[in-house]
């Protein structure tokens, strides 16, 4: 079991670094796997899980390592570029947590039997809230981005769209 716990720690660090250095220019929040699906009802399904009440109470790497992560709150002054960065970070966070869930399956080799199954289930359930939070916030960020793009078009500025 100790080897599985060490493995979880190692892949956590490796995937964190990967998430920081991976190119973000190919991330499209409107395309698979990040796009919104019909069952999500534009994020309403996550609101029914009360994500808006608990999302700020889970540990967040942007608060733990603020010098390595972009701020995840918009504040009162923001622009299209800020929202774009937040969308990229949102998709990256979801991707990393899904990759952690998949890579975590290796713990079943390190800790065979029911102990490994329970350990993996806990690991998966530990990553699931972060995936849900990203999927809850993405529709709001996309709507905000679209409003800002429309504002830029009305101003006559050049707008870059995915």
What role is predicted for each listed range?
Residues 2-31, 35-44:
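N-terminal signal-anchor transmembrane alpha helix
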Residues 7-12, 107, 116-127:
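Hydrophobic core segments of alpha-helical transmembrane domains in multi-pass membrane proteins
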Residues 10-14, 66, 70, 94-104:
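Hydrophobic alpha-helical transmembrane segments of multi-pass integral membrane proteins
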Residues 11-15, 19, 100, 126, ...:
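Alpha-helical transmembrane segments of multipass membrane proteins
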Residues 19-33, 130-145:
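Inner-leaflet juxtamembrane helices
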Residues 26-86, 143, 147-162:
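Membrane-proximal soluble regions of multi-pass membrane proteins
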Residues 83-115:
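Transmembrane alpha-helical segments and their cytosolic interface motifs
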């Amino acid at each position: 079991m100790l080897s599985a716990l060490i493995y979880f720690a190692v892949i956590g660090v490796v995937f964190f670094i990967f998430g920081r250095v991976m190119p973000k220019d190919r991330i499209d929040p409107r395309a698979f796997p990040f796009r919104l699906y019909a069952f999500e009802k534009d994020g309403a399904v996550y609101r029914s899980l009360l994500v808006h009440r608990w999302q700020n109470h889970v540990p967040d790497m942007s608060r733990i390592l603020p010098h390595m992560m972009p701020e995840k709150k918009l504040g009162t002054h923001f622009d299209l570029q800020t929202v774009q960065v937040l969308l990229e970070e949102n998709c990256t966070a979801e991707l990393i947590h899904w990759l952690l869930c998949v890579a975590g399956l290796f713990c079943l080799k390190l800790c065979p039997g029911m102990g490994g199954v329970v350990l993996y289930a806990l690991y998966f359930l530990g990553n699931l809230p972060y995936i849900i939070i990203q999927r809850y916030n993405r529709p709001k960020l996309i709507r905000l981005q679209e409003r800002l793009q429309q504002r830029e078009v009305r101003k006559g500025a050049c707008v870059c769209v995915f």
